[in-house]
């Protein structure tokens, strides 16, 4: 998890792009983790959980079939390896290596630590003008990822926000100081998310936190919604309707009636992906082949690329290499068969979380909220960049809670016991 925040020194494209393979420190660490899990399984130290095998095997199989059926197998091979890494090998390694609640607590604690570190650095960037450029000023918080991965920091901080929210809900059990400390941490994370100016992360986080609060206490969810609305009105009043944060928030409401160029490009990419799937409904055009078919199916309104700028990487123009919708990306590149594999995996995790639900267990709350965040975020974003490995780790952690842990010790400091069998 810590390696995810190590700067890669170069731009990366989303999963399924045609810009080559970007290997990050997180990828190297994940390879070591997968190798360690494989050695333990081969030596008989740990056994492959049957439920996890049945959840991940269909996705691996459909990825293999759609890759073999690709018009350009050589191009699709790297995409196959990447998708298997993120959606199969890394989560499965986490399921195999996490033994009990203490191990699961270490995973979530490391995510929280990374998120707080990125948040503090992002806030410093925004306040000192060292962030990514937006509106001609370098005030957008991007953390250690830089403008070339402009969405990465908001995802990491969003994941950390989910973890700390779950811990904050059970904080009263651990002393009077636990609640203000948790609230202070949430304040830091929330400020960084606002300064990241990521509309997609705001929407997905609102849905995930809303689900978490409703599951924990419906009355608390209502009070939290009222407080957030009041704080929003105060913020708008203080900013006088100006400022990048208010403008980005207002652009969410205007994304249908008056979309900006970014949203308009997204609509055109969605339409292109839909047309590709219509012509290749079963196995798609092959993983990583969306860019090769994009211009054939997209309208002339589509921009030639997006612009990024920051003091470290300078000005860069990046081509639009994916539809910015994971579901449409899967349908266009892997067809209905590929989507069936992903639905099987995510459905197994959701069903496992439902059957082992315990709204008083922070680990269950994190697993459910992360899954909701992912499902909502995939509606207008796709997998890409250095946060892929972190997503795979958290998917594995959610699967641990969904499928049951191998050992069930009593709760350690700061942990709450729940149903895991």
Model-derived features: where do they sit?
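Transmembrane signal-anchor hairpin modules in multi-pass inner-membrane enzymes, especially those
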Residues: 1-65, 102-109, 168, 176, ...
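Interfacial juxtamembrane loops and adjacent helix segments
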Residues: 256-263, 288-327
């Amino acid at each position: 998890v810590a390696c995810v925040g190590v700067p890669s020194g170069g731009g990366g494209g989303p999963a399924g792009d045609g810009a080559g393979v970007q290997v990050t420190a997180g990828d190297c660490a994940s390879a070591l983790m997968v190798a360690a899990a494989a050695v333990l399984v081969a030596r008989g130290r740990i056994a492959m959980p049957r439920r996890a095998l049945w959840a991940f095997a269909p996705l691996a199989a459909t990825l293999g079939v759609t890759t073999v059926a690709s018009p350009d197998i050589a191009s699709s091979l790297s995409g196959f390896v990447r998708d298997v890494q993120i959606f199969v090998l890394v989560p499965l390694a986490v399921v195999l290596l996490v033994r009990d609640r203490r191990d699961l607590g270490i995973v979530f604690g490391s995510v929280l630590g990374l998120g707080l570190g990125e948040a503090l650095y992002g806030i410093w960037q925004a306040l000192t003008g060292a962030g990514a450029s937006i509106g001609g000023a370098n005030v957008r918080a991007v953390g250690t990822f830089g403008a070339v991965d402009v969405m990465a920091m908001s995802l990491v901080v969003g994941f950390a926000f989910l973890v700390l929210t779950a811990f904050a809900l059970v904080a009263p059990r651990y002393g009077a100081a636990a609640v203000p400390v948790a609230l202070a941490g949430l304040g830091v994370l929330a400020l960084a998310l606002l300064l990241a100016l990521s509309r997609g992360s705001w929407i997905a986080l609102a849905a995930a936190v809303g689900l978490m609060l409703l599951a924990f206490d419906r009355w608390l969810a209502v009070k939290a919604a009222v407080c957030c609305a009041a704080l929003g009105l105060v913020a708008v009043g203080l900013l006088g309707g100006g400022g990048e944060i208010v403008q980005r928030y207002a652009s969410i409401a205007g994304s249908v009636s008056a979309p900006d160029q970014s949203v308009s490009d997204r609509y055109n990419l969605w339409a292109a992906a839909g047309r590709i799937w219509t012509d290749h409904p079963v196995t798609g055009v092959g993983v990583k082949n969306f860019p090769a078919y994009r211009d054939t199916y997209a309208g002339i309104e589509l921009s030639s690329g997006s612009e990024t700028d920051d003091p470290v990487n300078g000005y860069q123009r990046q081509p639009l290499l994916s539809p910015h919708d994971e579901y449409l990306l899967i349908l266009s590149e892997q067809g209905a068969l590929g989507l069936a594999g992903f639905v099987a995996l995510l459905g197994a995790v959701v069903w496992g979380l439902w059957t082992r639900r315990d709204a008083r267990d922070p680990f269950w709350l994190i697993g459910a909220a992360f899954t909701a965040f992912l499902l909502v975020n995939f509606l207008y974003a796709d997998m890409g960049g250095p946060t892929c490995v972190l997503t795979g780790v958290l998917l594995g952690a959610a699967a641990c809670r969904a499928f049951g842990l191998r050992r069930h010790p009593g709760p350690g400091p700061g942990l709450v016991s729940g149903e895991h069998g």
